[in-house]
Structures are given as structure tokens and as C-alpha cells.
A protein has these predicted regions:
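Enzymes that bind and transform nitrogen-containing heteroaromatic metabolites
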Residues: 1-176
Length: 176
């Protein structure tokens, strides 16, 4: 299973501005690129705060064939949103989540955040690539890309300036 962590971050490494969840602050160029990039994946994993930020949008896409799993300590709190095989909630480990996806014949997973999900998958050694859009903004505080101490080596795959913007997309391979 290919697992790609996809994220937009400020130049100083924050994925959410101050105490505001979500990436509404990201450039329109990144938002266009992100929507297109998601088409390369047949499944998505995110933490519950990320889910709550995009809940209404995701629930309207439940029939698009993408299997979405939301990591939460309390899956029962989301029972009303559960759609088996399309949108599921779990407190399982990252390895167990990937087994569920693999058993459902999924091959490419977009890891969408937030920092809790990033930490769990990186700590487990399950991330193959990281695609980060570096936005030309400095926040000074907010939600970091990761919260736990990490020492993960990466190798650059590519970098490109997103069209009509000052945003930089960098793709890395995780060295295992």
C-alpha cells in the first residue's frame, strides 16, 4: 500500500493557523492542486479534527468510491456518520487501518492529517512519501506538521511552483 502524507503548511511549519482548524488559509492554487491530487488515491485517512472540519463536504461525496477512515479515540461518537466501506471511524492502530484498506483492495492512501495522524503513521514507519505545499505565509504559532519528536530522513522526488502562485510543492520519499 502506498501511503502519501499530503499537507499544506506555512513557511514556519504550521498546518493550521493559530487555533483555527483547517486550511482555508491555503492558496487557491494549492486548493486546486489538492483536489486534483486526491484523484490519484482510492482511500484517505484523517484524524477526527480534520474530519470535523470537512465533514459536510465529505458526506456529500460518499458515493465517489473513495474509502475514508477517520482516526478517533471515540468511534461511537460518529456512529450516525458511519457508512461501511465508504466512511468509517476507528481507534485502531495505523497498521490495522492499512490492513483494513488492503483487505478492501485499496492500493493508494492519502494521509490528510492532522498532526496526530501524521505522528501515528510516521512513528509506525508506514508513510512512503510526503507531498507538502509550502505556502508563503508565516504564522508564528498554530498546529505543527508533527507534535512528537521525529528524526525522519527524506529524499526529494521533485519540486515545483504551483501555477499562478508563490506556493511551492515539494515531494519527498521517506527513507526507511
Amino acid at each position: 500500500m502506498l501511503v502519501v502524507l499530503i499537507v499544506a503548511q506555512s513557511l514556519d511549519g504550521f498546518i493550521a493557523r493559530h487555533d483555527e482548524p483547517g486550511v482555508a488559509w491555503a492558496s487557491s492554487a494549492d486548493q486546486r492542486w489538492f483536489r486534483q491530487a486526491l484523484g490519484e488515491f482510492d482511500c484517505q485517512v484523517m484524524a477526527s479534527t480534520t474530519y470535523q472540519t470537512v465533514r459536510d463536504h465529505l458526506r456529500s461525496k460518499s458515493e465517489d468510491g473513495c474509502f475514508r477512515i477517520v482516526m478517533t479515540r471515540r468511534p461511537q461518537n460518529f456512529a450516525a456518520d458511519q457508512e461501511t466501506g465508504a466512511l468509517e471511524f476507528t481507534s485502531a492502530s495505523p497498521a490495522a487501518i492499512l490492513r483494513t484498506l488492503t483487505d478492501s483492495d485499496r492500493t493508494a492512501c492519502a494521509l490528510l492529517g492532522g498532526a496526530t495522524a501524521h505522528d501515528a503513521f510516521l512513528r509506525s514507519g508506514l508513510v512512503n512519501e510526503i507531498w507538502v505545499t509550502i505556502e508563503p505565509r508565516i504564522f508564528g504559532r498554530g498546529t505543527p506538521l508533527v507534535r512528537e519528536t521525529q528524526d525522519q530522513k527524506l529524499a526529494i522526488i521533485s519540486s515545483e511552483r504551483l501555477p499562478n502562485s508563490d506556493s511551492l510543492l515539494v515531494r519527498y520519499r521517506v527513507i526507511k
